[in-house]
């Protein structure tokens, strides 16, 4: 690779060529952002915002049968210690300001998972005067988990999709 003319060559191709050459010698070429994203996916701390029946299924993910902590996903009680907020259940107009306040207390980068039909779009109570038709009207949502209520497996799948999304996208500047 030394002495080769790489003018106009895509950055990714150069990185792959250097990686191939250095891997034989026991080195790994990466960026600081990739290392930070890798570490962040292995230590996601989620906080519950359980509003209805979906919260029961959300609790199941921490129990021995599903054990979300084996994926590096652990619950936290404080929004200031959390990376992920899981909104589970029917969000009412009266509860919406509290949701936004808790979201604003979370440190950057922060992620939101909308769990269940009610959090995704109002669900069964969609046409009620007191229900917000989706928590994405109050906070930006990264992952939607469908179902009424979604199973613990569906939530685990959503959490793993969030880990993949974090690895795929840069999170230093959001």
Swiss-Prot record:
Matches recorded under PANTHER family: NADH DEHYDROGENASE, NADH DEHYDROGENASE [UBIQUINONE] IRON-SULFUR PROTEIN 7, MITOCHONDRIAL
GO CC terms: plasma membrane; respiratory chain complex I
Keyword Transferase applies: no
Gene: nuoB
Function as written in the Swiss-Prot or TrEMBL entry: NDH-1 shuttles electrons from NADH, via FMN and iron-sulfur (Fe-S) centers, to quinones in the respiratory chain. Couples the redox reaction to proton translocation (for every two electrons transferred, four hydrogen ions are translocated across the cytoplasmic membrane), and thus conserves the redox energy in a proton gradient.
Name of a matching Pfam family: Oxidored_q6
Alphabetical list of HAMAP family matching this protein: NDH1_NuoB (MF_01356)
Residues that coordinate or bind [4Fe-4S] cluster: 53-54, 118, 148
The entry's keywords: 4Fe-4S, Cell inner membrane, Cell membrane, Iron, Iron-sulfur, Membrane, Metal-binding, NAD, Quinone, Translocase, Transport, Ubiquinone
Major localisation: membrane
Enzyme class: translocase
Name assigned to this protein: NADH-quinone oxidoreductase subunit B
EC numbers on record: 7.1.1.-
InterPro entries: NADH_UbQ_OxRdtase-like_20kDa, NADH_UQ_OxRdtase_20Kd_su
Record text on cofactor binding: Binds 1 [4Fe-4S] cluster.
């Amino acid at each position: 690779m030394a002495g080769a003319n790489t003018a106009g060559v895509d950055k990714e191709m150069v990185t792959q060529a250097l990686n191939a050459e250095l891997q034989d010698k026991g080195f790994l070429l990466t960026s600081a952002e990739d290392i930070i994203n890798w570490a962040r996916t292995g230590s996601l701390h989620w906080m519950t915002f359980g509003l209805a029946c979906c919260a029961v299924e959300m609790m199941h993910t921490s129990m021995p049968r599903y054990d979300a902590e084996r994926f590096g996903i652990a619950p936290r009680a404080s929004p200031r210690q959390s990376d992920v907020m899981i909104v589970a259940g029917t969000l009412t107009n009266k509860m919406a300001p509290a949701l936004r306040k808790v979201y604003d207390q979370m440190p950057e980068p922060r992620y939101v998972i909308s769990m269940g039909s009610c959090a995704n779009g109002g669900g069964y109570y969609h046409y009620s005067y007191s229900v917000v038709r989706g928590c994405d009207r109050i906070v930006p949502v990264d992952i939607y988990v469908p179902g009424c209520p979604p199973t613990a497996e569906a939530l685990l799948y959503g959490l793993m999709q969030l880990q993949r999304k974090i690895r795929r996208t840069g999170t230093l500047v959001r």
